[in-house]
């Protein structure tokens, strides 16, 4: 026989070497959706314990960006891993569909409501636009390989959801958390509306920084407090502000009761300043000489009166803890209509909450002659001039500082007292209850707890009303004169909700009050306000989770969003759920960081460093994107660049190559007929299955703790090191040259089969497309999809009490590593070509020699040499090479004999078998005899 190649068990598989993901994935998706994969999973998991990850709705505007991909893929990894862990984990994607960004887009298309189109036409166009945006984003999310109920997502503009949002407001009112008041709220003049905290961003702004004097009305009273008999010139309390435009609303000056204040004489006037700030104030205003006339506590000055610098009335000195020594003068100009701290302290002292600014950001008529009708930020310089003319300006300079701006317009915003509806944090104990609930939630990373606790502890009442067209109406009736809510509000809200459930929010705007109020209609008016969109999304635990049948009435186990949502969706959901149900809407909250480029810079179109998920999928495939996300520690910033994605593609190839090797060597293996019992397997094969079990234990623990980068690290270690660098290399000889149906070969295939069954499941949550592809090439009967399965339970490990236990094989690996170094040196010296041309002698101490001798004649297979023998360490010649292992030296020589054309080992018995004279004795046995026996390697 001359062609012995036909006697080899060469690897063979239809599983392609190249993933070609960009081309293959769309075909897989087509099959998934034609066969209703999501429905198949739901049926397979029916009756299992549930795990509900509630989708925080992205805003229905624009194409998805790389941050969307991170968010959706992380959710998908969790949902799929929970399914493999034995849970029924339905995933219902959602979209946030109301609000200002959509209004602005539609305004560009058809004009403002009430001008070119009616409000009803405008809302209809907004609904249509949002639906188009949802369709576009949905297609991209599906392309990512994210499985969910895409045919029945939840939209906050669904009629039923809109109705349930209104019902959620009704329950908040029933529980006593709603109140109306003229409170200062973040106000955008460009929007003409109040903004939620989450709609506020901070940018640098240059403002006038001014020190202003308020002259004492009763000089004698002030002198008495400081124990001073006379001063030169007027006595003034000095305030420092960077918002001169708020001075028309000033109604007090706040001091800190505990601070020491000094009366300081400068040229021609005496100033009252916090003692600790005198030096810094003098330096700022350019005064080099001053005299301290007297001291007193802030508490001593309470209710003394001072003259407003230009409005001609007196204002009191009041006391507040919000006054600090961080900057300024120790005296804070207080305008209750323009700041939350000012509002609180003004309420305490029963001061007027003045609001001289209109919704367009301009002063109302009657504010001050030079200011009436002026835009507030343009009035800053006017006010500085007025103060200068009145000799009330001590100092002015420009200051660059961080200033709140509208997230949409990027323009500076103001605090402005307006009639609004609020969810009260304290009137029914909502703040206290929310803080208590936070402690029962698992926050991942754990610093999230302290972050949201601080936000809840310090946040003002939540302004939930907006003056917008495209939003869920508040659906309230108030008395024309008293402005009190109708006594039958709960009943009326349900009546409106039923109409909205049938016809959408337009039903409210079309509603004639007489239809629900009867004769009472003449006494009541409809509230024109809409709800903050954060109320829409924040109530989805009630409007969606509580009512979707697949959730079975269970609350959400997890919310997962970017770390900005502590003050956004996590906060609004907590507020509403606690106000309605008295408990948090989630058990776990997981946050991820934001994407940055390879240099750590924020993604920006202007810089040109954005990465489009669509481009990545079209070029590399979604599985590369998924592997990048899975391999990243998402708790901090998430770096992405072409180079980083290339590394992910390289890692993908290593994993795919391992999977392909496994499949190729399972050719012809039927697990039902050909599997070898563990006790009959070659020891090395049992060790390999044990390696898989150890890897699986770590991988499952990492999935359970949402440490997906640890999953990928362990997967890579298993594929590259334990399998690629050792086991898969060693078994090639036995796999290819042993008799096809021998125990030696079937033992190896049994190990490869068990490893493949585990590997495909480890991959499935992260590399979903490739896992599905691999699943369809695995031998044996199996379910249609890996996604309906659970973690593989067929793995087993070596017993620690066995002689050839894991520790034994760890020592063999170390010896092999040292042998490889010697072989590599010999190859570099041109003494040998490949490792099979080598014969090695291992000079080992007694302990190591005993271990190596247990492998008997199979030792050389573990070392990938043609021959290997063990000698006593003390007999090592000088030519033997020392190693990094204590008690081991190695001598290498050329292997004797000739190269067998079948197994490529160098043997001296080639030609000894008359039937097969061209091959070695071992190959002759494998070709024409009963086949060789392997026990260890």
Curated annotation (Swiss-Prot):
Transmembrane segments: none
Main subcellular location: cytoplasm
Residue ranges of the motif 'KMSKS' region: 602-606
Necessary cofactors: Zn(2+)
Catalysed reactions, as listed in the record: tRNA(Ile) + L-isoleucine + ATP = L-isoleucyl-tRNA(Ile) + AMP + diphosphate
GO MF assignments: aminoacyl-tRNA deacylase activity; ATP binding; isoleucine-tRNA ligase activity; tRNA binding; zinc ion binding
Binding note for cofactor: Binds 1 zinc ion per subunit.
CDD domains per UniProt: Anticodon_Ia_Ile_BEm, IleRS_core
Motif 'HIGH' region location, chain numbering: 58-68
One Pfam family, short name: zf-FPG_IleRS
Listed EC numbers: 6.1.1.5
InterPro entries in the cross-refs: aa-tRNA-synth_I_CS (IPR001412), aa-tRNA-synth_Ia (IPR002300), Anticodon_Ile_BEm (IPR033708), Ile-tRNA-ligase (IPR002301), Ile-tRNA-ligase_type1 (IPR023585), Ile-tRNA_ligase (IPR050081), M/V/L/I-tRNA-synth_anticd-bd (IPR013155), Rossmann-like_a/b/a_fold (IPR014729)
Ligand binding (Zn(2+)): 900, 903, 920, 923
GO biological process, one term: isoleucyl-tRNA aminoacylation
Metal-binding as UniProt keyword: yes
Catalytic EC class: ligase
GO cellular component: cytosol
Binding site for L-isoleucyl-5'-AMP: 561
Residues reported to bind ATP: 605
Signal peptide: none
Family as reported in the entry's similarity comment: Belongs to the class-I aminoacyl-tRNA synthetase family. IleS type 1 subfamily.
Designated name of the protein: Isoleucine--tRNA ligase
């Amino acid at each position: 026989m001359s062609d012995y190649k036909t006697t080899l068990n060469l690897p063979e598989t239809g599983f392609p070497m190249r993933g070609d993901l960009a081309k293959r994935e769309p075909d897989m998706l087509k099959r998934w959706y034609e066969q209703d994969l999501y429905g198949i999973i739901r049926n397979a998991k029916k009756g299992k314990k549930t795990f509900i990850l509630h989708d925080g709705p992205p805003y229905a505007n624009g194409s998805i960006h790389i941050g969307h991909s991170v968010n959706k893929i992380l959710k998908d990894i969790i949902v799929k891993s929970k399914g493999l862990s034995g849970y029924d984990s339905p995933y219902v994607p959602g979209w946030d569909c109301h609000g200002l960004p959509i209004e602005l887009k539609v305004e560009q298309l058809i004009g403002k409501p009430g001008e070119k189109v009616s409000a009803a036409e405008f809302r209809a166009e907004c609904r249509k636009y949002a639906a188009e945006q949802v369709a576009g984003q949905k297609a991209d999310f599906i392309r990512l390989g994210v499985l969910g109920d895409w045919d029945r997502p939840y939209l906050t503009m669904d009629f039923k959801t809109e109705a349930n949002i209104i019902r959620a407001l009704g329950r908040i009112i029933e529980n006593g958390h709603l109140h109306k008041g003229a409170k200062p709220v973040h106000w955008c003049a460009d929007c003409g509306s109040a903004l939620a905290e989450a709609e506020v961003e901070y940018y640098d702004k240059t403002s006038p920084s001014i020190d202003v004097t308020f002259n004492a009305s009763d000089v004698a009273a002030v002198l008495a407090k400081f124990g001073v008999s006379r001063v030169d010139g007027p006595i003034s309390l000095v305030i420092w502000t960077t918002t001169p435009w708020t001075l028309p609303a000033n109604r007090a000056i706040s001091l800190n009761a505990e601070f020491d204040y000094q009366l300081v004489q400068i040229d021609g006037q005496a100033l009252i300043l916090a003692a600790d700030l005198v030096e810094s104030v003098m330096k700022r205003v350019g005064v080099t000489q001053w005299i301290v006339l007297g001291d007193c506590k802030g508490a001593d000055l309470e209710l003394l009166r001072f003259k407003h610098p230009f409005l001609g009335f007196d204002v009191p000195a009041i006391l507040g803890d919000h006054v600090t020594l961080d900057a300024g003068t120790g005296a804070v100009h207080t305008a209750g209509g323009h700041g939350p701290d000012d509002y609180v302290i003004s309420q305490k002292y029963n001061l007027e909450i003045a609001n001289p600014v209109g919704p367009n950001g301009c002063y109302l008529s009657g504010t001050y002659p030079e200011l009436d009708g002026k835009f507030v930020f343009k009035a800053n310089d006017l006010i500085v001039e007025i103060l200068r003319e009145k000799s009330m300006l001590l100092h002015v300079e420009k200051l660059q500082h961080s200033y709140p701006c509208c997230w949409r317009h990027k323009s500076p915003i103001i605090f402005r007292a307006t009639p609004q509806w609020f969810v009260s944090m304290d009137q029914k104990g909502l703040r206290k209850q929310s803080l208590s609930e936070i402690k029962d939630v698992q926050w991942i990373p754990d610093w999230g707890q302290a972050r949201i606790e601080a936000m809840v502890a310090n946040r003002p009442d939540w302004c939930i009303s907006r003056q917008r067209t495209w939003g869920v109406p508040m659906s309230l009736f108030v008395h024309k004169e008293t402005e009190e809510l109708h006594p039958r509000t709960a009943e009326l809200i349900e009546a409106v909700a039923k109409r909205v459930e049938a016809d959408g929010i337009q039903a409210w705007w079309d509603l004639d009050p007489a239809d629900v109020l009867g004769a009472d209609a003449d006494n009541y008016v409809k509230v024109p306000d809409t709800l903050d969109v954060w109320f829409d999304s924040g109530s989805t635990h009630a409007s969606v989770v509580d009512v979707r049948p697949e959730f079975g009435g269970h609350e959400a186990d997890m919310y997962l969003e970017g770390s900005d949502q502590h003050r956004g969706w996590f906060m609004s959901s907590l507020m509403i759920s606690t106000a309605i149900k008295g408990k948090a809407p989630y058990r776990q909250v997981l946050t991820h960081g934001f994407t940055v480029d390879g240099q750590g810079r924020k993604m920006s179109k202007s810089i040109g460093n954005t990465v489009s998920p669509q481009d990545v999928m079209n070029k590399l495939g979604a599985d590369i994107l998924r592997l990048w996300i899975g391999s990243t520690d998402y708790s901090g910033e998430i770096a992405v660049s072409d180079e980083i994605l290339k590394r992910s593609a390289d890692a993908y190839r290593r994993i795919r190559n391992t999977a392909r090797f496994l499949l190729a060597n399972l050719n012809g293996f039927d697990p039902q007929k050909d599997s070898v019992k563990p006790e009959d397997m070659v020891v090395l094969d049992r060790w390999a299955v044990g390696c898989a079990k150890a890897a699986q234990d770590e991988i499952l623990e990492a999935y359970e703790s949402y440490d997906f980068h640890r999953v990928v690290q362990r997967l890579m270690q298993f594929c590259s090191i334990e399998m690629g660098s050792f086991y898969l290399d060693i078994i090639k000889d036995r796999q290819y040259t042993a008799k096809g149906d021998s125990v030696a070969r079937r033992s190896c295939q049994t190990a490869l089969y068990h490893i493949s069954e585990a590997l495909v499941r480890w991959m499935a949550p992260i590399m979903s497309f490739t896992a599905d592809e691999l699943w369809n090439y695995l031998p044996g009967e199996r379910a249609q999809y890996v996604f309906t399965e659970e973690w593989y339970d067929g793995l087993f490990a070596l017993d620690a009490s066995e002689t050839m236990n894991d520790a034994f094989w760890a020592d063999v690996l170390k010896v092999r590593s040292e042998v490889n170094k010697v072989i590599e040196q010999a190859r570099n010296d041109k003494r040998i070509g490949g490792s099979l041309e080598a014969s090695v002698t291992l000079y080992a101490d007694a302990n190591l020699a005993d271990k190596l001798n247990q492998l008997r004649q199979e030792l050389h297979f573990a070392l990938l040499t043609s021959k290997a023998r063990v000698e006593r360490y003390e007999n090592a010649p000088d030519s033997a090479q020392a190693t990094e292992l204590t008690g081991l030296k190695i001598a290498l020589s050329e292997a004797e004999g000739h190269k067998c054309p079948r197994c490529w080992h160098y043997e001296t018995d080639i030609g000894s078998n008359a039937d097969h004279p061209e091959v070695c004795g071992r190959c002759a046995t494998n070709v024409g005899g009963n086949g060789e026996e392997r026990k260890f390697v």
